[in-house]
Amino acid sequence: MTTFYTVISWLMVFGYWLLIAGVTLRILMKRRAVPSAMAWLLVIYILPLFGIVAYLSFGELHLGKRRAERAKAMWPSTARWLSELKESQRIFATDYSEVARPLFQLCDRRQGIDGVKGNQLQLLTTTDATLKALIRDIELARHNIEMVFYIWQPGGLVDQVAESLMAAARRGVHCRLMLDSAGSLQFFRSPYPGMMRNAGIEVVEALKVNLFRVFLRRMDLRQHRKVVLIDNYIAYTGSMNMVDPRYFKQDAGVGQWIDLMARMEGPVASTMGIVYACDWEIETGKRILPPPPDVNIMPFEQESGHTIQVIASGPGFPEEMIHQALLTAVYSAREQLIMTTPYFVPSDDLLHAICTAALRGVEVSIIVPRDNDSTMVRWASRSFFSELLEAGVRIYQFEDGLLHTKSVLVDGQLSLVGTVNLDMRSLWLNFEITLVIDDDGFGSDLACVQDDYIARSQLLNAAEWQKRPFWHRIVERLFYFFSPLL
């Protein structure tokens, strides 16, 4: 009997080390970024069983077998749609500013579609303005409304949006609503899903959180886009979730959330529509390709509208597209670079690009919230400040709420606005969307918004920063080591 237990014990020890060795080899064979690989190996060696479970759950990009098959199956029809769209040569821009040209070339080569012109674009700088404009557009909708959001939380003006959407469905407008399962947990626990379905709205819970499937799909892969499409002509996107900040996370101690949204009219709605169609097919298996833009009702003269490129990321989309776009934008800067983000945990490549821009004389400013709703991200962000300050980057800490805007402005001409945070999750994992706008007029509007943020911020003093407590530095470095996992 003793021999039997001895054999069992040795088999368990052998299996234990074999499992660790197997996961280690798997991490090394994935050719992931070195900091990310090292962070995962550290977790596995310090807390082996927890680390292995965590890695298998969150360490690899598992979309799930069914969704992966749908993503693969949808591309032939999507490619045909893009090919047909490219035949409408009049909607595509052919002339770009010097600072924007490299980024638009990258997007064309990697996504197979160039920037579209003839769009009317409006910045909405407050949640009230956005929700009221959206309600008006929903009330005027005639054919179809598509929405996708990470968070939909009932309360305040959001309830008016819901009522307008249900009224639109009742009068015959085809309405689709896709919400992330984790982000919109309160919505799915409320009466609204049933009310909306009864009104005729197709409501989809995207990427359902299911602990029984934890090893079959990565649970922290989230649908992070915020998009509204109306009648294949009007489109919204930006940083705002479907929440009224007066009712959202009031107990978080960070103040009201500050967001920025863009409202567009024109052919860009079709290019955003194909992104929505892909998301819908991946989640439901149903194909809903949008119609091509109506070339008879759009102003195509370059002077009459904005040139916009849509960048989409996530499983099934070109890998590292958002990351490469940001790097290209930063390296294109010659005079000024202003970046706004609520969560600043950049990749090494992006950090070095930002510092290099400052070192070659570009005026670089980063605007982040002073208080953050994520303690881990707040400490991890602070770990990058010393290197940025040494390079000459100006860091502004916003003091009038949680600044949730995600924007980049390069030389007052090239603008990026969308859902992408400057952190690993947005850069490598989630379903995200970003607009690229080549227009100095829009750049001026965005600069005014950023100037307002700066006026409500405190400039971080490099000398004072060096005087922070020693224990702060220890905590910062600890979270810095795990920043590739955040």
From Swiss-Prot:
Residues covered by the PLD phosphodiesterase domain: 219-246, 399-426
Superkingdom of origin: Bacteria
Keywords from the UniProt entry: Cell inner membrane, Cell membrane, Lipid biosynthesis, Lipid metabolism, Membrane, Phospholipid biosynthesis, Phospholipid metabolism, Repeat, Transferase, Transmembrane, Transmembrane helix
Pfam families: PLDc_2, PLDc_N
Main subcellular localisation: membrane
Reactions catalysed according to its record: 2 a 1,2-diacyl-sn-glycero-3-phospho-(1'-sn-glycerol) = a cardiolipin + glycerol
Enzyme Commission code: 2.7.8.-
Active site, per annotation: H224, K226, D231, H404, K406, D411
InterPro entries linked: Cardiolipin_synthase (IPR022924), CL_synthase_A (IPR030840), CLS_N (IPR027379), PLD-like_dom (IPR025202), PLipase_D/transphosphatidylase (IPR001736)
Membrane topology term: Multi-pass membrane protein
GO molecular function: cardiolipin synthase activity
A GO biological-process term: cardiolipin biosynthetic process
Protein family per UniProt: Belongs to the phospholipase D family. Cardiolipin synthase subfamily. ClsA sub-subfamily.
Protein function: Catalyzes the reversible phosphatidyl group transfer from one phosphatidylglycerol molecule to another to form cardiolipin (CL) (diphosphatidylglycerol) and glycerol.
Record-linked PANTHER family: CARDIOLIPIN SYNTHASE, PHOSPHOLIPASE D
Name of the protein in question: Cardiolipin synthase A
Gene source species: Serratia proteamaculans (strain 568)
Gene expressing this chain: clsA
